[in-house]
């Protein structure tokens, strides 16, 4: 269907089921932590930031292991199993450090599965469909994130304040995800970079005069056997992630302004409707007009949303900005992964995705803790303003240092 291989579809359904479980809980966590368990905004930042940092450390090892392991599917199965077992334990927590422990275990599972799963997806792509495949996968993630909060809202409508029961029931979609992984075939080993590396430019950017051949300096790998183009992108991405704090702060401000959690899960669901729609479009655009342009659009949207949250205290305005936020995810997330796959040799893609995920996670730790401190010490407006400014700076550097001439495909598929 849609020209995508069956394993891509199966992994998409796995992500849908897992996200349905995770996102049924996530939009309620800021309220649960701050109102039920008595945590502060700083504690919220520590919980979410540290969880993502642990996730990132695990992803470095899992990416390298995925390159060496004869069974990427085994790592994916292990990761999804850990998360599916850990997440429902939020139902019995009585303090924020306990939630912290559960969230860390959940993110350990995500860290184990992320890089090998992304490397598996790369096997079933071609240079012209890579953006579409990763965009589709993100779209299925977002679709699961639509279904989960919608079910949570319906459940809480009939059973008000039964948060713990809802959390416990997330074991059901988690079990479905684990069962589906068993149907995914183990991908064949990728060819070596000598056999697979090619120097074909991406899309219309090949029209630039400087794209005919790469210099001998550009051909040289950086540390870890990865090209310098990849390193440049990771450095720019690092700056962006320093302003990319946990989405829990957006939900916390919405909850504070709304004065209730009644509509928060539905708004989270609506956000993912936007994400799921735009991610497929963004992936296809990146195959046609180039990765850099689509990523830049997404980062600019992010900057606008954070500035909007800094300047607005009106609920209708915040709800509008919150929905616009979905365009950032739709344009940037899948396209960033497609660019990583473009720049990394086939036999190093697992490690490359591990580095990419590590940059994201470590940045989330720093961003979330700093955001929480600024919120507590100064104001929410100052914290959101800083995030927007860093996103603008990163976008400018992306356009300057990640040049079109550097976006070369390295593919291990015919």
Task: For the regions a language model picked out, list residue spans one by one.
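Helix-loop boundary and gating motifs at the non-cytosolic
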Residues: 2-55, 230-267
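Helix-to-loop junctions at the C-terminal end of transmembrane segments
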Residues: 58-71, 156, 278-290, 375
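Helix-loop junctions at membrane interfaces in 12-TM secondary transporters
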Residues: 91-103, 310-321
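Symmetry-related core transmembrane helices of the 12-TM Major Facilitator Superfamily/SLC fold
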Residues: 164-182, 382-400
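Helix-loop junctions on the cytosolic side of multi-pass membrane transporters
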Residues: 173, 181-194, 399-411
């Amino acid at each position: 269907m849609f020209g995508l291989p069956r394993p891509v579809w199966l992994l998409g359904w796995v992500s849908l089921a897992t996200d349905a479980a995770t996102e049924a809980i996530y939009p309620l966590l800021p309220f649960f932590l701050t109102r039920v368990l008595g945590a502060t905004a700083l504690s919220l930042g520590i919980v979410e930031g540290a969880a993502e940092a642990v996730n990132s450390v695990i992803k470095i090892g899992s990416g390298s292991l995925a390159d060496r392991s004869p069974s990427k599917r085994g790592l994916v199965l292990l990761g999804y199993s850990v998360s599916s077992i850990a997440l429902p334990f939020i139902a019995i927590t009585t303090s924020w450090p306990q939630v912290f422990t559960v969230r860390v275990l959940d993110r350990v599972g995500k860290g184990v599965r992320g890089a090998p799963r992304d490397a598996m997806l790369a096997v079933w792509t071609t240079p012209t469909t890579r953006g579409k495949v990763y965009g589709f996968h993100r779209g299925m993630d977002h679709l699961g994130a639509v279904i989960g909060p919608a079910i949570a809202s319906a459940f809480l409508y009939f059973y008000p304040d039964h948060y713990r029961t809802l959390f416990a029931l997330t074991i059901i979609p988690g079990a479905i995800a684990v069962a589906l992984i068993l149907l995914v075939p183990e991908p064949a080993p990728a060819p070596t970079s000598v056999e697979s590396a090619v120097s074909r430019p991406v899309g219309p950017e090949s029209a630039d005069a400087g794209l005919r051949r790469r210099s001998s300096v550009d051909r040289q790998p950086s540390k870890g056997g990865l090209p310098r183009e990849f390193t440049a992108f990771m450095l720019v991405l690092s700056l962006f992630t320093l302003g990319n704090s946990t989405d829990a702060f957006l939900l916390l401000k919405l909850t504070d302004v709304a004065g209730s959690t009644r509509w928060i899960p539905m708004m989270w669901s609506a956000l993912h409707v936007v994400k799921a729609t735009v991610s497929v479009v963004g992936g296809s655009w990146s195959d046609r007009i180039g990765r850099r342009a689509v990523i830049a659009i997404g980062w600019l949207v992010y900057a606008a949303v954070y500035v909007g949250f800094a300047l607005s205290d009106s609920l209708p305005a915040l709800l509008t900005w919150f929905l616009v936020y979905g365009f950032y995810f739709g344009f940037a997330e899948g396209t960033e992964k497609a660019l990583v796959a473009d720049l990394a040799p086939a036999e190093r893609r697992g490690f490359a995705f591990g580095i990419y995920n590590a940059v994201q996670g470590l940045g989330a730790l720093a961003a979330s803790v700093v955001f929480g401190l600024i919120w507590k010490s100064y104001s929410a407006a100052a914290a959101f303003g800083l995030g927007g400014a860093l996103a603008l700076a990163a976008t400018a550097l992306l356009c300057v240092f990640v040049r079109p001439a550097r976006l070369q495909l390295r593919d291990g598929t015919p």
